[in-house]
């Protein structure tokens, strides 16, 4: 029964998304509004791990990460046009190969049976040692799947992808992520080019064109039309501090880089901004959208809106004109009882931008 319902939803949304896409072709990519997923690669925490952690969760943190996603190609088939990926550096390999929680909990499912986490390269997990269930152990495998899907759907509308470079202090198990450096960010760019292909990426250089800076180009609305961006991806770095600055170092206006950065409005590198509180920042987002920036915001966070079936944040996100709205619930949760589901009219996930078009 569940499969039949999903199939009906998929077919109806696919048909509508195709007709909707035609209507968007002559708009620029900053003149549309799309819905996408947050931590798109994430699987649910295994029940036995969740049970063990919940008994020790005095801060009631665990319910905030009680969400999951269908495989990324299925998300794209459904019509989502934004993804979010967390990326851990692992230049020597093996740093995240054995989640420490497995020393405390016996699980029925093996972790990384093909030992992909033991090899050098960028890894995709949510929280080391705890929330480690993922559709992709490596960024390489994820990019290969994105290319495969894109090649099979060459006329797909552009897909926005937020990349969050995860590092920071050691967790309670003592695992300290590898810290990013300019050479590691060079490796990240090369990974995108190698496994997805530069021809499939909308780069800062593409948008800057002949303008003096990327920001000047954005303020002149120098974004491509949807029909000219079909089959492509646009990446944004989800960091507004040290890692952002490291990525941009020696790359003024992000010259030669593959990924946009969350840089302050008015700075040479500023083009795409992350403003996650549409209720608080409604007028600010609307103003930035009108100026030419692309904005990412959120319909929900930490499962709270889904548990209370509260759509007020999503309504403000739509009203704000933010081009990208992320959610954990493009489909209702199967982990707790809720009818909460995010989408536009007729089960679509893409439409004209209400602030910039009529």
Where are these regions (language model features)?
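Bacterial Sec-dependent N-terminal signal peptides
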Residues: 1-21
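Catalytic cores of phosphodiester-bond hydrolases, prominently lipid phosphodiesterases
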Residues: 20-85, 89-358
